[in-house]
C-alpha cells in the first residue's frame, strides 16, 4: 500500500518536471541553488569600506610645516595604521626657537595616544621590531614597566588584601614610554590619554606661535567629592593607618658613567669612577664621541682624568695610550673652536700656546716620573700636532715657540731612545716644523747639515729627501741643497723618481744660474754613473732642462739617450 503510493507520487512529480512550461522554472531554480551552494555563507563578506579621512572623529597625523625625512613619515603611518596609535603630532625641535634641552639630543619628537596599558606594551614591542627590520637600527626604550616587572609587583602587593587597590593605581601611572629610534634623531612618546592630558608635552615642544593652541586649560571649578561615599572614606582611613615598609614609586634611573660623560655632567661622572674597571679608557672614548664644535671645560676634564688614574700598581701601555689620545682630543676640540672664530687675536693664541706647553709638561714629564719611557709613536703624534699648530699663526715668534716645545719633548728621549732622531718619520716632521711659507729658522740648515754629515742618507725614504729638497729650494739655500744632494748621489740614495722631483723643483724656481750649474758642472753625469733606468717622466724633465740652458748639449743628450 505504502509502496504503490510512493511510486505514484514519484511518477507524477516526474511528469510535472518534464512539462514544457515548467522546465525553465526547474532549471533556473537548480542553477540558483547550485550557485548559492558554491560559495558558503561565512565567506560572503562585504568588502570593508575605506575610512573617511574627513570624518571629525578621525584625526590625521599632524606633521611640522618644515621639510621632514621620509623615515619620519614611514614610522608615523606605521603607528597610526598598524598599531592603532591615535592623535599623532610631530614637532620639529631642530628648527625650534624654544630653549629646551631636547634640542641637543633629538631633531624630531612624536607624541601619540594608546587605548590602554596593555596596548602601550604591545606598541612598544612592535615598534622596536619594525625599526630594527626596516632601518637596521637598534632603538632604546625607557619609562615602560615591562610585563615581567608588573607581574612581580602584583604578586608582592597581592599578599596583603588591604593593598590590592594600589597596584591598579600604579599601573595607571606608568602609562608612558619614550623610544629613541636612532633614525634621523626621532624621539617617540607613546602614552595613554590620561597620562597625555596630565603631562601635556605638546606645550613643551611646540612653536611659540602654537603655544596658545596646546596650552593646558585649568578647570577652576573641579567637581566636589561625594561626602556620603562610605567606601571611599573607609579606603582613605585604611591607607592612612597602613604602615608600609617599602616604596611603591620606582626610583629614577641613574645615568651610567658613559652617559654622564656624554652630557658633560662631570660631577656625576666623578662619583661613578669607582664603578668602572678602566675609567680612563671610557673617558677617552666618550671625549672622542662628542661633536667637534662643542666647547669643553678642559680644566675639569683633565681633573677627572687624573682622578681616573690608578694609584696602585704600574701604569700599563693601555693607560698611556688612553692618556695620549685624551690630550690629542682636547687639543683638536680647542683648535676647532679657535678656527671657527674668524677674529683671531694675539691673546687667544697666547693662551692656546700655554695649553700646548702644558701638554709637554704633563704627558712626557709625568711619564718619565712614573718610570715609563715615551714611545716613538707618541713623539710622532706630538710633532703632527705642532705642525697643525703652526697653521694658526705663521709668525716667526710662533715658529720659535713650537720648536722650543719640540726640544723639550726630544729631551725625554735623550737617554731612553737617542736614535729616535734617525727615524725617517721623525726627520720629515722635524724639517716641516722648522719653516713656514715665508719664514725659516737657522736651525733648519744646521739640521740638514747634521743629516748630511752624521746620518746615513741611504736609510732616508723618498718622502724625507723630497721634503728637504722642497724646503731648501723654497728658501734658495743653494750651498746646503747641493751639499745634501751630492751626499745622496754618493750613497746611491736617489732613484729615477727623486731625480725627476729634483729637476722639476729647480725648473719651477726657474733660476737660470742654478740650471746652468746643474748642466755645466756634471751633475747629470751621475745618472749615467749610477746606471739609473731613466723613466719617461725623467726624460721629459731632462729635455726641458736642456732646452732652457743655452747650448746644444749634444754629448749629454747622446750619453743619456734623450
Curated annotation (Swiss-Prot):
Q: Where in the cell is it found?
A: Mitochondrion inner membrane
GO CC, any one term = mitochondrial inner membrane
Where does this protein chiefly localize?
Answer: mitochondrion
What UniProt keywords apply to this chain's record, in alphabetical order?
Answer: Membrane, Mitochondrion, Mitochondrion inner membrane, Transit peptide
Q: How does it sit in the membrane?
A: Peripheral membrane protein
Q: Which positions form the organelle transit peptide?
A: 1-36
> Among its keywords, does the record have Mitochondrion?
yes
Q: Does the keyword Transit peptide apply?
A: yes
Q: Which GO terms describe its biological process?
A: mitochondrial gene expression; mRNA stabilization
The entry's function note states: Probable mitochondrial mRNA stabilization factor.
Homology family: Belongs to the ATP25 family.
- What is the name listed in the Swiss-Prot or TrEMBL entry for this protein? ATPase synthesis protein 25, mitochondrial
Amino acid at each position: 500500500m505504502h509502496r504503490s503510493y510512493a511510486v505514484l507520487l514519484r511518477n507524477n512529480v516526474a511528469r510535472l518536471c518534464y512539462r514544457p512550461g515548467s522546465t525553465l522554472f526547474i532549471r533556473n531554480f537548480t542553477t540558483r541553488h547550485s550557485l548559492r551552494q558554491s560559495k558558503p555563507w561565512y565567506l560572503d563578506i562585504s568588502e570593508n569600506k575605506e575610512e573617511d579621512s574627513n570624518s571629525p572623529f578621525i584625526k590625521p597625523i599632524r606633521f611640522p610645516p618644515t621639510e621632514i625625512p621620509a623615515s619620519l613619515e614611514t614610522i608615523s603611518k606605521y603607528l597610526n595604521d598598524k598599531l592603532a596609535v591615535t592623535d599623532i603630532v610631530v614637532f620639529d625641535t631642530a628648527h625650534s626657537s624654544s630653549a629646551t634641552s631636547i634640542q641637543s639630543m633629538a631633531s624630531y619628537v612624536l607624541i601619540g595616544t594608546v587605548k590602554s596599558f596593555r596596548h602601550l606594551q604591545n606598541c612598544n614591542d612592535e615598534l622596536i621590531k619594525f625599526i630594527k627590520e626596516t632601518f637596521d637600527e637598534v632603538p632604546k626604550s625607557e619609562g615602560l614597566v615591562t610585563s615581567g616587572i608588573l607581574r612581580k609587583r602584583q604578586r608582592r602587593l597581592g599578599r596583603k588584601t588591604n593593598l590590592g587597590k594600589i597596584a591598579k593605581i600604579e599601573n595607571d601611572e606608568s602609562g608612558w614610554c619614550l623610544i629613541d629610534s636612532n633614525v634621523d634623531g626621532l624621539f617617540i612618546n607613546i602614552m595613554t590619554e590620561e597620562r597625555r592630558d596630565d603631562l601635556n608635552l605638546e606645550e613643551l615642544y611646540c612653536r611659540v606661535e602654537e603655544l596658545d593652541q596646546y596650552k593646558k586649560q585649568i578647570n577652576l571649578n573641579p567637581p566636589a567629592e561625594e561626602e556620603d561615599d562610605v567606601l571611599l572614606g573607609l579606603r582613605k582611613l585604611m591607607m592612612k593607618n597602613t604602615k608600609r615598609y617599602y616604596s611603591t614609586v620606582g626610583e629614577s634611573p641613574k645615568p651610567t658613567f658613559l652617559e654622564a660623560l656624554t652630557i658633560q655632567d662631570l660631577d656625576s661622572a666623578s662619583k661613578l669612577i669607582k664603578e668602572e674597571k678602566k675609567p680612563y679608557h671610557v673617558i677617552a672614548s666618550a671625549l672622542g664621541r662628542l661633536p667637534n664644535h662643542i666647547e669643553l671645560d678642559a680644566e675639569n676634564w683633565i681633573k677627572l682624568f687624573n682622578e681616573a688614574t690608578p694609584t696602585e700598581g704600574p701604569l700599563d701601555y693601555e693607560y698611556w695610550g688612553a692618556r695620549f689620545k685624551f690630550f690629542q682630543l682636547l687639543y683638536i676640540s680647542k683648535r676647532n673652536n679657535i678656527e671657527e672664530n674668524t677674529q683671531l687675536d694675539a691673546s687667544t693664541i697666547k693662551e692656546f700656546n700655554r695649553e700646548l706647553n702644558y701638554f709637554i709638561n704633563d704627558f712626557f714629564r709625568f711619564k718619565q716620573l712614573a718610570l715609563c719611557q715615551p714611545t716613538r709613536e707618541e713623539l710622532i703624534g706630538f710633532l703632527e700636532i705642532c705642525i697643525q699648530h703652526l697653521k694658526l699663526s705663521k709668525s716667526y715668534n710662533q715658529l720659535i715657540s713650537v720648536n722650543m716645545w719640540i726640544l723639550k719633548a726630544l729631551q725625554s728621549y735623550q737617554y731612553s731612545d737617542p736614535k729616535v732622531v734617525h727615524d725617517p718619520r721623525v726627520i720629515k716632521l722635524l724639517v716641516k716644523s722648522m719653516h713656514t711659507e715665508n719664514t725659516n729658522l737657522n736651525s733648519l740648515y744646521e739640521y740638514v747639515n747634521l743629516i748630511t754629515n752624521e746620518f746615513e742618507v741611504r736609510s732616508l725614504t723618498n718622502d724625507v729627501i723630497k721634503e728637504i729638497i722642497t724646503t731648501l729650494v723654497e728658501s734658495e739655500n743653494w750651498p746646503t741643497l747641493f751639499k745634501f744632494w751630492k751626499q745622496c748621489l754618493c750613497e746611491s740614495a736617489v732613484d729615477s723618481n727623486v731625480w725627476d722631483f729634483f729637476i722639476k723643483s729647480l725648473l719651477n724656481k726657474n733660476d737660470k744660474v742654478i740650471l746652468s750649474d746643474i748642466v755645466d758642472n756634471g751633475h747629470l753625469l751621475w745618472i749615467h754613473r749610477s746606471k739609473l733606468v731613466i723613466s719617461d717622466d725623467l726624460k721629459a724633465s731632462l729635455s726641458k732642462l736642456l732646452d732652457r740652458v743655452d747650448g746644444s748639449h749634444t754629448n749629454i743628450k747622446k750619453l743619456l739617450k734623450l
